[in-house]
Structures are given as C-alpha cells and as structure tokens.
Amino acid sequence: MCTSADVRGQQKAAMSLQKSFPRRQYTLWTIVSCYLLAISDVVTTEERALFSTLASRLIPLVEPARTAEEAVLKARVLELLPTADQLISFLCDPATEKWNNLELATMRLDALVKSGNWEKVFDTSMTTLATENRDDFESWKQMAYAATKLGNDERTSALIELLEKRCKTRNGALAGVYYASLKSTEATFNAAKFYFENFGRQQCAFDDLKSYVEALDAQKWLAFVDEQITFAKSMEHATQNEVHILVNARKFHYLLDPDDKSFVDKNILLYNKLLTSLAFQDKLETDYFYGDDLIIMAATWLLQGRPVSSPVPDQDLVILVIILLETAASNDKHQFRVRLWLTRLYLYIGSFQQALGHYNALAIKNIQMDVLSHYLLSRVSTICPTWKPLISTRDIYDSNAVQTPYHIKKIYESGAFSQVAGCMEFGKRLSDSVNKGILCVEAKRVARILGMKMEGLGINPILRSTKWKENRDFSILYGSTPEETLENKYRIGPIQTGVWVNALILRETIIDEFLTADKRREYALALKELLEKQDLQSLTHVEKWSLETLLELSSIADSATVDGVAVFQTTLIEGMEKYAKLEETSLSWEWFHSLYIVVETAMISIWSLDSLVAIWGTKKNGKVVASIAACKKAVQTVVDDIKEDAKKLKLRRDKWVRDCVKRISELDILKKLDTSSIDIEYLIERIGRGQDESLTILRNTKI
Amino acid sequence: MTSLKPFHATDLFRVNAVNLDVLTENYNIAFYLSYLAQWPSLFFSTENPQGEITGYMMGKAEGRGKDWHGHVTCLSVAADYRRIGLARTLVDNLERQSEDPYDAYFIDLFVRASNALAIGMYKQFGYSVYRRVVGYYGGEDGIDNEDAFDMRKPLKRDKNRESVREDGENFRVRPEDVYL
C-alpha cells in the first residue's frame, strides 16, 4: 500500500491489523492512516469528517503518548476537529510541553494565533524568548502583534523591555522594526535605521528590511543608507563589512529608484574598484564575493529595460549582459546566481553548449534535477537536441519509485508519525511531477531527431490522466519574484504545464499508433478535444501548429484522396515556410525552436505517409499514392532549403562574430567594465559555436 | 529574521538557495528520508519571514553506553545568510534535543583537518578536538586522503567530561576504529 501510495488501502490494512491483533502499534497505524485519508484529496467531504472522527476516537486507546511523535500525531488529529479548543488545550498542557519538541512548539504558536487568543500568544512567545532563551523570530513577531492587539500596558512594557534588552541581536532588532511597522512610518524609519546601523554589514540586511522600507520615503531612506557607506582606507581596500554595506545600499537603490539612468554605470565602476579590495582578495575560493551582486543588479536592470545613460540596441542586449555576468563568473567561480542567469541567457540565444557549461558547474543532482533542470532542459529537443543531460535527469524518478515507499514503511515502523504525511506528499509530487512528464516526452523527441533507437521510450497514454504536480523553482533566479516578470520575459517559451505534457503525450501516442486505425482515431479525438477545450497558453504557436498538422495527418490516414492530400500538402508547406523564416538579425531560442519543430513535423509527416503507402500496398488508388509522393517531395524541398539556410548562417559565422564584437565593444557600458579576466571576442565566438552546433544537428537530421 | 522549523520531506523541494552552494552536498532521496524516519526531531531548518529556507541541520543519535551521543551529519547555511549566527542557532537546537529527549552524553561531528574556518567556529561553540581520524576523507583513487578531526562537546549527562580530552589533535585513530 505504501508502494502504490494507496492511503485507502493503508487504512483498511491498518484497521484489519488493529482488529485482529489489538497491539498499540497497529492502533497508532490506524490513527495515522485515518489522518492521512482525512487530509487527502481522494475522499469526499463526508468521508473526511468520518475519518477525522474515527482517528480522534482511537486516540484514547494509545494514551498517554509515549513519545513526542505520538504527541504530534494526536495534535494533528485534533487539528482536524471543527473547533480548536481541544487542540490548544493539549498543546499548552505542561505534559505536552515537556516533550521539548519543535513540531509541537510550532503547532502551539500557530494554533494560538489562529484562535486569536492574544494573551496566550503573548505569554507563550515570552516564555520561548525570555524563559527558554530561544531566539525565534516567529515568536517575536507574534508577541509584538499580540501586544498591539491587546493594547495592554503591562504586556507592552514587557515587550519593549525585552526589545531593548535584545536590540543588539538580529532577531531582536528586526522584531523592533516589525513592531514599529505596526505603529507608524516614522517609528518604522527609526527602527529600520537602527537595524541597518547595527546589521547593515550582513549580506541578509537588504532582504530583512526590504518589505518595510518600501513603505518609507524612498529618498530619505536612500540618503540614510548612502551615509552608511564608509571606508576606513579606501574603496579599493574595502573590508568585507564595508563591501556588504555598500552593496546593500545599492540594492536599496535598485528597489526604490528604478529611474536612475546612472545606476548601471555606477554599479560597474564600483565593481571594478572592489576587485582590488581586501574583501575580494582575501575571500576563500568557496566563498561568494558579495560585490558580484553589483553586476547581477546591473544585468537585471538592463534586462528589465530600465533607463540607462547610453542605450543598448535590442540585438546586443543579451550578449552585453552575458559579458557582464561572465566577468563576474570568471572572478568568482562558485557564484550560483550568476551561473543560473548565464545558463538561462545562453539558452535564450540558442547557444546550448555554453548554457550546459554553466549548468554543469552548478553540479545539480538528485532532487534538484526535478526542481532546477528546467533551466537547461526546457524545450531542449527543439533548441539543441541532446541526450546525456536529459537521460541523467530521469534517474531521480526511478529512485523515488523505490526509495520513498520503502522509507514510508520505515516511518510507520519507527513511529516517526510527524513525517508520514510529508513523505507521502513528497513521493506523490515526484511521481506526478510535470517535469518528469516533460522529460519523458522530450526524450522521445530527441531520439527521433537524432535518429536514435526508440525502444524503451514508449509513453503510456494513461499518463495524461495524471494530476501533474509543479515542483519547479522559477524564483531562485535573482531579480525574480512573484510580482516581477523578469524571469518570465527571458523564459524559453511559456511554462510547460500539465496541458503541454498531455498534448505531447497524445501526439506521441498518435504517432506510435498511427497504423492502428481505431486507436489512432481515439487519441486524435482526445487531442482535438484538448486543443478545443483546454487552456493552451503553455504551447507556443509552432507547437500548436505541429499538433494540428498531426490531426490532419490522422484524417488523411482515415480517408486519403488526391484533393485531401493536396490540401494537406499546401497547409503543411505554408506552415513550414512561415515558421522556418530565417531571422537575419540574431538567432534566438525561438528561431531554433521553430526550425526544429518544422523539421520534426516534416519527419513525422513523411514517416506517416510512407507507412500508409506501405500498408496500402497495391490496393490503394495509384493517384493518391502519386499525390503522397509529390507531397513528400515538396516537404523535402522545404527541408533542404532550411538546411541550406542553416549552412549559409554557419558560413557567415565569422562575419557575425566580427560584427558583433565591433558593435559590443563600442557600447559605452562595456567600456566602463574591467573585462581583463575574460576575452570578449572568444566569448562571442563561443556563442556562435554553440549556435552552430544546433545548426549542425539540424542539418544532419534525416527525413 | 530567523525562525526554527521542523523539516519535512517536501522541504527538499525548497532548499535550493542552500544546496546550490558548492560546499553543500546534494544527497540522494534515501539519505534524507532515512534521517527523517529515524531522527525526525534532529532534522530542522531556519526560515526567513518569506518562508524561504536559509539553513538546515541533519543530526542523528547513535552509540552505546557512554558513547551514546548526538551527531552533526550536515549543517548548511545559504550564502546570503552566513555570519549571522544561524549555524549557532542550528547547533544549539541540536544540543538541546540531544540532551532532551535523547539524553546523550555528548555531541560530535567530523570536519576536515584543513578546514580552519569550521574548526574555529565549532571551538567558539565549545567543541574541542577529541581525536584525529587518519585518512577519513578519501581522496580520488585512494590517494591524498585527508584526516578528519572528530570534534566533541560534552552535554549535561557527561558530568565528569569523560567524552572530551586534551590535545585531541595528536590522538590518532584509524577510520575503522570509529564507531558507525
């Protein structure tokens, strides 16, 4: 039951064990499984209430709790009840507190806050902070909020006294800022000032304060932080603390003054000077240099299209930003935020090998493959079809299928009940990961384009009924927040969602079952419905066209006529020519993506038509077979033209590099940067080589 | 701003800011889940107010008799949140848990003998070198193995401080002499 994540089965099995062998352990298992069912999405509302009640009625059979984990289990069951009284009473009971358990302590505070029992919130938080001497910000925050809600002089005084006593600790100082933010803007400003004066030298100072500072007078705050920038000797000899204050101040400028045309220039000049600083020279190789954030800010400022002192032509913007970031990367090998952006931007301009280099430097592995591999592998089959990184990413899902159920069983056996729900969800999220679905599809497409064997790559069409889970992290990219669209702007097409996966699964299934008429029709109908009824925002235009073309092919397979084949040929060629139009200015992921889909669609079309002719043999009308031959020839001609254009692009590469180097070198922004650690011409040449590799693979495809 | 939170398996999707650091190992699923299954209260994280994980501790409890101890398996803090006391917060909580409910005699950890930064940090926390485990960290192809320092801090139960010693840097043992 654990292997198949069948919570109903777990509950039934546990219940049977408990009734047949009334051991304490089996009663606990029954309670756990009832709880899992009650919080799952496989039960009805009535069943949810039923299993909650059942679990709570079984609790007395295992009391008193013998371990903290059993106490956590009881608390989780009590959480399901309609009112919180029993839960709060249990969590605040001294017998429960004696477990000294973080999970119970967290639940206690959460439950008290939700209940609005502010006196208890205040007292509990005070105990945590003052009596137990545990410096927990959540306790600080809730205590401050409770004091405000209560408006009680005694408690307010106690809070203020503790804040003053602990004002030199980070949590204490920040709690002061939070408390002030509940009072007034003036109080917030003074508290934030105090915090920055004492902790502005920490890298986290900006993140700690930014949400409060946004409500303040921007110019007043910026003037203050600028005053904090001091150097004992000079900027060129800045210490780590001095660099941190400087960079934090610049981050506030980034946040609060988005119209400053001189921002990029200033950041670049500051970065140049800091390369001789003690902070940079003395850092360990495995440490990050915080000064890199000056470059990252400059890069994201440019990418966002914010004002600059000297404008950058659109065609050169991404390459300029790449140069900035490569400079930072060459000086600071382990800065992952720089490398993530470089991975993304190289892919954005279709230079996969350069993206791969930076991605490999990040040493992403195991669970990270599910969460972060999209930075490299989004639409990889249509940017630069590549096998090895794609296949190695799939290992995590095989591992999950074996390891997670095994450890869920271990959790039942060891009584680590606080972990069951989390592990089950973890296993499900990996098993149903949309990234997994994407990679399954992409593996098949890469194999097709590269002419590899397709055995073992079959996709079960039942998978399209999966409720795909989103685990990917899009916000780790610097400058990307839920409110910002920067990551969105430089993404490799719209986010591929479950709809994308389902559509492509259907496509692959139709291709696999092309010669089995009833199955082909069934899946073609399903694909047609999907295209008509689902939200198709996750598909690019050319992807939609390719799916529609496959549906037309399916119709041909049903009833091929001379006219039908001729119409198909016309629409196919029109689409191919439309989407394969060569961009003269600069290559991009979009162009490669369109080209590869056009060529892949041509491949599938020709293979399908050939298969039909082979099946028909001599039975079919000779004119239809002849029209199919004409269609194939027309398609081949377009593909040949595409390959020829790709070849011409490759041959123009040297000129492209020279022109690009000349244009980029004349950009004022670049002239300000100390690029002594990189070779710009070599970098641009490598960009070109990366793009050429994709062009070479394209030209080598066999239709 | 730091809040301590218990760690759950689904948090493994949220540790990127920590685990993208070059010094932080990304273990396979089995490793993380085995710790959650066996020592759930010794696996916890710190979060900022945006709910982002800024650091975490993977600990365990092992040993027999007077060797019953807590152990720091993995302590990792995101680059942006270093040098603000998060490591201290995480280690303190592990010590707290190791005393109650685990009632351990001491806490220990292994650190590369060349890692002066980590050694200095743990000494500030009250740890001392108990012994040098020769060749503990295997180099590639078995060459260039590096020694580890087994650093320890006695807990309340060890009233006579039997779990620590002077001059541990020169007390050499082989890896096979170290209990699992």
Each PLM stretch: what is its role?
Chain A
Residues 1-18, 29-33, 68-161, 293-297, ...:
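Internal alpha-helical scaffold/solenoid segments in large eukaryotic proteins
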Residues 16-25, 56-66, 90-101, 126-135, ...:
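Solenoid-like repeat scaffolds
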Residues 71-239, 505-662, 666-669:
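Non-catalytic protein-protein interaction scaffold segments in large eukaryotic complex-forming proteins
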Residues 389-532:
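Extended alpha-helical scaffolding regions
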